[in-house]
Swiss-Prot record:
Protein name as annotated: Leucine aminopeptidase 1
Source lineage: Eukaryota, Fungi, Dikarya, Ascomycota, Pezizomycotina
Binding site for Zn(2+) 2: 195, 234, 343
Keyword vocabulary terms for this entry: Aminopeptidase, Disulfide bond, Glycoprotein, Hydrolase, Metal-binding, Protease, Secreted, Signal, Virulence, Zinc
Disulfide-bond pairs as recorded: 310-314
Protein source organism: Trichophyton equinum
EC number: 3.4.11.-
InterPro entries the UniProt entry points to: M28_fam (IPR045175), Peptidase_M28 (IPR007484)
One GO term describing the cellular component: extracellular region
Length: 373
């Protein structure tokens, strides 16, 4: 997630030595894209310097030769009315703050979740085990639901859970699982409770809720559903780029992608005297999908929205957008009021509001069900 004006408020990060994969990237160069057509070769250290200045980017070093970013997306007709209120409300009733607190306590206990560290690998393995357990306990695995690791050229893997539907067209919800201490990426303590442990456990709890519905569990929903947990977001949207580039190359159809990056911090709004709200990202997203999401929020959530801008390549929805798939993002607040502790050793669970995270989980359940069922 990006820093922007949050930078000025960020706490000082402390470097703590820990086990890691000994990778020397000081001399290695990476090709990044900072805006459409604006590319630059940088070292890993220069990547983090850009991030500290609030500059986001795609790392396109491993992009296929001849890749062309999408300039337009296919026209998709989204529902204009709510059709599955009874089913969604039944799912929402099962959402549990206690589950989210338990999962986030564990996820943020890893020394860090840096994409090149042993800890990043261990945390991804633990997270995938939780996803598999949810699928198994729901009985969905008997109808073809599965979770797979998506391997990259770094140690942390991405995770994709698939619940088949009657159509191969996919409804995607995603969140990045990695964390970073920008002062000491490889070895520094980076609990990443909000960025983005909060989004990761939000969609995990939403998956539990969605799999309470037997129509979905038994593969009878109109569309296929996928939940994604991306590796390497902080280093340039690496995991999500790889996944959506593969989907483009193999001709997969994505009806819509909703990104959840930071879902738990409300103090910035409270301190300003603002009503606690969702931050609806309005730039580099699908306007029609975002309009559909506004309808879902109005129906199923108890808080309003504030429009906000995130910038180019600010989070994983941008990877879907770049590959021609309609995407949207809803954040915990307006971007200028995000958690000031992100990317430090102070991004702790104690700063988060689980009632707010439940609102995000309600949104995810409503989004998936109304679009897929």
């Amino acid at each position: 997630m990006k820093l922007l004006s949050v930078l000025a408020l960020s706490a000082t990060a402390t470097s703590v030595l820990g086990a890691s994969i000994p990778v020397d990237t000081r001399a290695q160069k990476f090709l990044i894209e900072l805006a459409p057509g604006e590319t630059r070769w940088v070292t890993e250290e220069e990547k983090w310097e850009l991030k500290q200045k609030g500059q986001d980017f795609f790392d396109i070093t491993d992009e296929e030769v001849g890749f062309t970013a999408a300039v337009a997306q296919p026209a998709i007709a989204y529902p204009t009315s709510i059709r599955h209120a009874d089913a969604v409300n039944a799912m929402i009733a099962t959402l549990s703050k206690e589950n989210m607190q338990r999962d986030l306590t564990k996820l943020s206990s890893f020394h860090n979740r840096y994409y090149k560290s042993d800890y990043g690998k261990q945390s991804a393995t633990w997270l995938q085990q939780q996803v598999q357990a949810v699928i198994n306990s729901s009985g969905a695995s008997r109808y073809g639901a599965k979770v797979v690791s998506v391997r990259h050229n770094f140690v942390q893997h991405s995770i994709v859970a698939t619940i088949p539907g009657r159509s191969p067209e996919i409804v995607v919800v995603g969140a990045h699982q990695d964390s970073i201490n920008q002062r000491s990426p490889m070895t520094g303590r980076a609990p990443g409770a909000d960025d983005n442990g909060s989004g990761s456990v939000t969609i995990l709890e939403a998956l539990r809720g969605v799999l309470q519905d037997q129509t979905i569990v038994q593969g009878k929903a109109a569309n296929t559903i996928e939940f994604h947990w991306y590796a390497g977001e902080e280093a340039g949207l690496l995991g999500s780029q790889a996944i959506f580039a593969n989907y483009k190359q193999t001709g997969k159809k994505v009806k819509g992608m909703l990104n959840q990056d930071m879902t738990g911090y409300i103090k910035g709004m409270v301190d300003r005297g603002l009503k606690v709200s969702f931050g609806i990202i309005t730039d580099n997203v699908s306007t029609s999908l975002t309009s559909f999401i506004r309808m879902v929020i109005t129906k199923y959530c108890s808080i309003p929205t504030i429009d906000t801008r995130c910038g180019y390549a600010c989070s994983d929805h941008a990877s879907a957008n770049r590959n021609g798939y309609p995407s949207a993002m809803v954040a915990e607040s307006p971007i200028n009021l995000l958690d000031p502790h992100l990317h430090t050793d102070s991004d702790l669970i104690s700063y988060l509001d689980f009632d707010h995270m439940i609102e995000h989980a309600k949104l995810v359940v409503g989004f998936v069900t109304e679009l897929a069922k």
